[in-house]
Amino acid sequence: MHRGPSLLLILCALASRVLGPASGLVTEGRAGLDIVHPVRVDAGGSFLSYELWPRVLRKRDVSTTQASSAFYQLQYQGRELLFNLTTNPYLMAPGFVSEIRRHSTLGHAHIQTSVPTCHLLGDVQDPELEGGFAAISACDGLRGVFQLSNEDYFIEPLDGVSAQPGHAQPHVVYKHQGSRKQAQQGDSRPSGTCGMQVPPDLEQQREHWEQQQQKRRQQRSVSKEKWVETLVVADSKMVEYHGQPQVESYVLTIMNMVAGLFHDPSIGNPIHISIVRLIILEDEEKDLKITHHAEETLKNFCRWQKNINIKGDDHPQHHDTAILLTRKDLCASMNQPCETLGLSHVSGLCHPQLSCSVSEDTGMPLAFTVAHELGHSFGIQHDGTGNDCESIGKRPFIMSPQLLYDRGIPLTWSRCSREYITRFLDRGWGLCLDDRPSKDVIALPSVLPGVLYDVNHQCRLQYGSHSAYCEDMDDVCHTLWCSVGTTCHSKLDAAVDGTSCGKNKWCLKGECVPEGFQPEAVDGGWSGWSAWSDCSRSCGVGVRSSERQCTQPVPKNRGKYCVGERKRSQLCNLPACPPDRPSFRHTQCSQFDGMLYKGKLHKWVPVPNDDNPCELHCRPSNSSNTEKLRDAVVDGTPCYQSRISRDICLNGICKNVGCDFVIDSGAEEDRCGVCRGDGSTCQTVSRTFKETEGQGYVDIGLIPAGAREILIEEVAEAANFLALRSEDPDKYFLNGGWTIQWNGDYRVAGTTFTYARKGNWENLTSPGPTSEPVWIQLLFQEKNPGVHYQYTIQRDSHDQVRPPEFSWHYGPWSKCTVTCGTGVQRQSLYCMERQAGVVAEEYCNTLNRPDERQRKCSEEPCPPRWWAGEWQPCSRSCGPEGLSRRAVFCIRSMGLDEQRALELSACEHLPRPLAETPCNRHVICPSTWGVGNWSQCSVTCGAGIRQRSVLCINNTDVPCDEAERPITETFCFLQPCQYPMYIVDTGASGSGSSSPELFNEVDFIPNQLAPRPSPASSPKPVSISNAIDEEELDPPGPVFVDDFYYDYNFINFHEDLSYGSFEEPHPDLVDNGGWTAPPHIRPTESPSDTPVPTAGALGAEAEDIQGSWSPSPLLSEASYSPPGLEQTSINPLANFLTEEDTPMGAPELGFPSLPWPPASVDDMMTPVGPGNPDELLVKEDEQSPPSTPWSDRNKLSTDGNPLGHTSPALPQSPIPTQPSPPSISPTQASPSPDVVEVSTGWNAAWDPVLEADLKPGHGELPSTVEVASPPLLPMATVPGIWGRDSPLEPGTPTFSSPELSSQHLKTLTMPGTLLLTVPTDLRSPGPSGQPQTPNLEGTQSPGLLPTPARETQTNSSKDPEVQPLQPSLEEDGDPADPLPARNASWQVGNWSQCSTTCGLGAIWRLVSCSSGNDEDCTLASRPQPARHCHLRPCAAWRTGNWSKCSRNCGGGSSTRDVQCVDTRDLRPLRPFHCQPGPTKPPNRQLCGTQPCLPWYTSSWRECSEACGGGEQQRLVTCPEPGLCEESLRPNNSRPCNTHPCTQWVVGPWGQCSAPCGGGVQRRLVRCVNTQTGLAEEDSDLCSHEAWPESSRPCATEDCELVEPPRCERDRLSFNFCETLRLLGRCQLPTIRAQCCRSCPPLSRGVPSRGHQRVARR
């Protein structure tokens, strides 16, 4: 830049003030006006003249214009001011053209040929006050602005006083200050939108125009200086607002700011705005209509500026773009004011019709509006529109949709704007900007605009002449606030650069800096080239590029931008892409598949566009609407898809690529494909196919790969057709599959073949090259006159003839073997030579001949038909009801052995075969058998026989069939036979409660359980010997049962539980141990004659009840234990398990149990009845239910430890004893009884143990023992009972000896075993060498009481495994029995484990007489050896069948019923019964997951009615039955022809109203109902048909002039004819004939009424 801004500053300020306020404003609102008389002086202050025009002296030896000085002096407020000013030579260039137009004519035109000397810049000096700059114009007095003591002063000649010779001209001086009213914040509105898209037709014109400029187009991305030669037009509103003298300076100031914006480095290109012409319109132009409607104004202005533009780009006044500045309030699309600030055509620059814009004058921000619209002309889109440079909420840019001025941030160009304008220039669309303007251009002022226009002036430009700056509102460099009336308003823009913001400070780029500070201009410099980028494509021809930036340094402060190449490109990745890969354009289109278009997602496919090959045009795959998705495709995209070309797109421009794959190299191939070749290696092959006969497709010849200049043509016209196929016989390029295609271009083997058919003559041409061999075929329809073909290929380098090459090739496929459905096609083999074509098979090698091919072929679907299966056997062998059935389906044949079933409706058009037919009805059936009633059962209980009579009823003539004779006898089973028993408790029977009240609550717990009733009201006997007192039984109370109770009375439990299926015991076995087996006991029936009760279900909420169980009728010896070998029974718990006491893993069952140990053993034993105190009976009150696996878990031993806790295991060996319910470890969920082998007698197994195994020297008991029922469980071995070395000897007395005392007993238990009580103090041998047995006389029987911890040597505290259990004994007495031996009584062992793990089972115990001989005890009072036991229900999950899937496709679900049931009778249980077992099976599963298929719909059939509302139907089927969504099933019918059954009926045409000269014919038109034949009153019912014409012209020919007959006189009287004439009747022919004298003939010029057209309706 030149070094002149500092000098230009004052002179431009002077010019601004000279062109400042309009006339008449000098004295308005000015305070402190002072009259001064300036004079011109010399440098020393000496007077020179009263004439103020500066005189310039020039030296002849100075060739260039030099600035001369001028000095002025004046007295102001007693101070002498001296102005030192200099001429500004840079304000306007020579040749400046300023036109003033009036009434559409050139009122004034001024061409500046020299720099005027009256525009001065300088300073003012005062001896005392601080001076400042001055900008003064002395062309007509002194006008301008100067600074004094940091205040602005204006000077102007005094209005109305002219200069007088010899006298100083008076001037007025006043301060420049605005109103200091209280500032109020006002509303501010953002600027409106702008920009106008180029219409498609004009865009095509641009493309055509640009193609004509190809010779000037730059082929690389080069940064080159661009000069925008600009025409600026200010309309009459601008002149009216600013005043004619001031508008020129104002426009130049605005354009100077615009030029500065385009010099900002953010634009990325060196662009200069140069004004070549300025037009000021004082009046409205005739051809330029400026209105509020911005689009119409822009259209008018573009047309007007084109007409006045001077042709020829070299002319000094030729402009590249035109700018209209107006004070009209513009609106984009309506003729009324709104918020639009400007409008322009996008990418319209350099186009003669589109390079124009309109901007609304809003004051100093007008510069940003002009720059914004010029940006649109450069092809820049709004930030955020189609790009990612949205500025809302972020930094504003010049191209923001709305011009928002951020506080303190200058407006610059965004990154997207830089890319848009660079692409515009690189595409060659700015060719008109390359020429540098001539020297005769308008020079723009370089002074900052704020120096010329202070804040008050800027406010007046924005809001009117009465607006002033609002002080103290905000930093003026950030936001300019102006007064409008009594409030302050702002357009949120900052004051322009150069505006004073404080003492000796001004605004510069939004900041307040010291005055006069202007940063030094820095010219830009190129950076180094970047590394080559990645290739734009992974295959095919791509592009990679390298760039450099103008960043070293970045141009600043109006420094020059870099000039030169900024981007270079080269090709890369030359290998071709695989043929099955989508094209590069297709890939770019598919990137928009995930974006919504018109509310839906689409799959986009490319659309070729040869007019704009480097734009991305795509369309949805299911639509034909084409959209331009990108302004430019990715670099490396081929320009054309429809033709062979190497040209690629680069920066949106189609670049030519030579055969050497260098951009713009110009290298070309010769006719056989040699790059830069001369054709010397080319060879043309020419052949003719002359076979005249053929059938179907016949091979003619082979065109090899790489062939060029291909020509195939028929020698003469014929009805045959040419076809092209690949080496794969299934792949046809043209006219394959017996289908003839249209004329046109077709892609074949990588090239384009042009198919032409004129009449019956066909030919094919292609430039080539072919990428694969192509077979030429002829589809014979008649005799072949001959086919000629030729092509050009490259000759081998050694110029030798190749030997013939023979190979097998497959021919075309034969016709399908079926006419419908699926058939078979076969493909034959031919022997082919590479160039000769088909030859005899003998030339090919028969050893490598491949097999002929075969494939399925699908023709049209076969029509549906009925299919009937085989007849089934007759349902009756005789009689009238015999029927035979068969399956009948509607099927469609899919192949030779494949059919598909269809809906029955598909075969409705065919008669359906019979599915049923009568059969065997002629056969007479034999007579039937008659049966009598069954007799009574032969027994009263148990199993018996019943009978009936059978007779043949002769109801037919045929005898009865003996094979069908019914049975006459059958078994009958009554209730089991009961036997009498003395039962203590008869209060409960059966299942459930004896009380009428039932408690079904799950958690119901009775506060007090009622005791059982007493058997008799006799006094309580005294306990003697080993009899234990038993308390009297209380009356019965309520019994609580589970909701799901179990009645097992139907089960026959009156069988021998001791034998079961085993043998009877042998009497020889009953002889050991001093005790014998009891005799056979026959039970008696229960006194109450009630069914045997069952216990409540284990695990239920209510308490389990021990009723009076009926004993088993047969009890074997195995039911007894040896005398003295006792087993303690586990006392069940009566208290509920709390949540804290429940062991881990145990089910929360909530059953009751009793505390352990009991308070007294007396509670357990009591005499059976009076008179027999020696007999014992175990008390079975309702508080002692049978032991359960779960109730064992919280039992306590005598030391308080819970039973079932494990300890270090003792050596184990099974021993014969009765099992007790096993204890359960904390992790067990159900009992697991040990399984043992059972024999037929207990004694047989016990004797060997005592005699053989229990001998001295044996350290262990036998490991395996076979015992009879009840089953045996393992028990701990008993080492050390008599010491470690004192095992049991043979003959050791049994443990029933009465000499043993409880102090000498030791009790050992193991989980799942019976308690064995053995002597503990037998270490001193007796006289016979055997251990002495302690005397137990007077003590309780062994095993009846637990050994106290303080009296025994081993207790539970020392060994947790040894845990004594309480005994449970029971005896029944009968006074009728003979008296037993003295003190002899029945002794019972512990109850065994229940025979089942769930449901109803049985338990056993050993019963023996205390004397060792059962005969000493009363047999009738023998206690029950067995009873029922009822554990938890046998619960299991039971699943039902899966329901039908809710959806056949698309994801459905099916459900099933899952219940907890009893496995015995399948009764439902509550779910918690099944919780301990396996997890609950799922009751829901997914199904129908396969995707749904779309419904198939056929076309609509013909409407059922022609009118009045009919119905159309169509076929709606699913391709696979059940795999379509039913809710989406399309309708198979719809209404049609809903219009009424009416039509227009017309009558015949009537007679013409005139014989000639134009008449009218009429006819009757009626709307008639076609069903009733009656006319409709409302003609609108026929509106669905066109209205017939009801009249038409007729006799349009002219009437011949016939000389009327000579009229002598009127035939009627004169008066009468006159009367008719006056009445207008002369027009009637009869009247005219009768009154020929009175009625003159009609004039030929008067039209007749026949020409008048009557109304249609």
From Swiss-Prot:
CDD domains: ZnMc_ADAMTS_like. Its main location: secreted. Residues 447-522 form the Disintegrin domain. Residues 1587-1627 form the PLAC domain. Disulfide bonds join 302-356, 331-338, 350-432, 389-416, 459-482, 470-488, 477-507, 501-512, 535-572, 539-577, 550-562. It is found in: Secreted, Extracellular space, Extracellular matrix. The active site is at residue 373. It comes from the Eukaryota. Residues 180-191, 1293-1304, 1327-1342 have a biased composition (Polar residues). Residues 21-220 form a propeptide. The keyword Membrane does not apply. A motif (Cysteine switch) lies at residues 192-199. One of its GO terms (molecular function) is metalloendopeptidase activity. Binds 1 zinc ion per subunit. N-glycosylated. Can be O-fucosylated by POFUT2 on a serine or a threonine residue found within the consensus sequence C1-X(2)-(S/T)-C2-G of the TSP type-1 repeat domains where C1 and C2 are the first and second cysteine residue of the repeat, respectively. Fucosylated repeats can then be further glycosylated by the addition of a beta-1,3-glucose residue by the glucosyltransferase, B3GALTL. Fucosylation mediates the efficient secretion of ADAMTS family members. Can also be C-glycosylated with one or two mannose molecules on tryptophan residues within the consensus sequence W-X-X-W of the TPRs. Residues 523-578, 804-863, 864-923, 925-978, 1366-1414, 1417-1477, 1479-1522, 1524-1584 form the TSP type-1 domain. Residues 165-221, 1009-1034, 1073-1127, 1140-1237, 1283-1304, 1317-1384 are annotated as: Disordered. Its EC number is 3.4.24.-. Interacts with COMP. This is A disintegrin and metalloproteinase with thrombospondin motifs 7. It comes from Mus musculus.
